[in-house]
Amino acid sequence: AHHGIRDSSTSRGLGDVYERQLQLQLECGGNGRSEFVPAASGNQWTTGAIGCPKFTGVRLRDVLNYCGVARDAVYVGYYGADTHTSGNPDADPISRGVPISKAMERESIIAWAMNGEDIPLQNGFPLRLVCSGWPGSVSGKWLNRLVVRNQVHDGEKMAAPSYSVPQTHVAPGSRVPNEDMKVIESMPVKSIVTFPRSGINQDYRQRMPVRGHAWAGDDQISGVFLSIDFGATWLPTAVGSAANRLSWQSFESWVQFPEPGYYEIWARAMDNLGRSQPMVVPGWNPRGYLNNACHR
């Protein structure tokens, strides 16, 4: 099933294709997992498992096309130099991937630099795959081998329940059979307020500047709105352009508190397809994926 490349013995240097620089979002599929009730299994991320650095590398499609991809290719899988997180040398480390259509996007790259410097070891040095807009687990780190498949890749963590959610909505706490799960692809619309920080005291007579970022998986942001009255009313913000497709977009505005008291600033983003963040944690699932509730 590894017969997607016409000449599997081909060896190429990355200098044979053009270097690219792209600012690309990487978000853990379980970003916001800690907010699910009952608790979902996995690292209890709050809302900070997202970044959007500038990567330097080459387009994955340029490498694949240079090697020659067979017509029956449907999936690209990766293998890294890491070992299983348990430390067991006999256990296979994560080996995920993306459909050939995602691999061939202009923004899918093999990167060796991040923010103008060699990628740090914990971020995948010396090479990592970056397939932005999908769960970060598809962007393999410590990359040492790619396989082009004529079937869906079957590496470690490709099968349910890993990086999968129920095909239909289920009641919180339900047991969901693996055959009733579907793999996560594009991540949902989401936002994060980066200023002000929580817990500050503010003179209510002064305007409070508000800044943050918004992103929408494979799609674009059409607007970001703020509320200081628990979602009763919403104020528009100024949303900047994306540095390139699949980069997050920054927003800024200000709020004026009407009187002294306790306030929360909520942010709610909308994408170009009209989908917006829910005000409560959506779609409970056993592994706690895809929480895109309003940031507050």
Question: What does each model-found stretch correspond to?
Answer:
Residues V37, L60, Y75-G77:
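Metal/cofactor- and membrane transport-associated sequence elements
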Residues A1-Y18:
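Short, small-residue-biased leader/transition segments that mark boundaries at the very start
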Residues S11-L14, N31, T194, P260:
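Intrinsically disordered, low-complexity serine/threonine-rich segments
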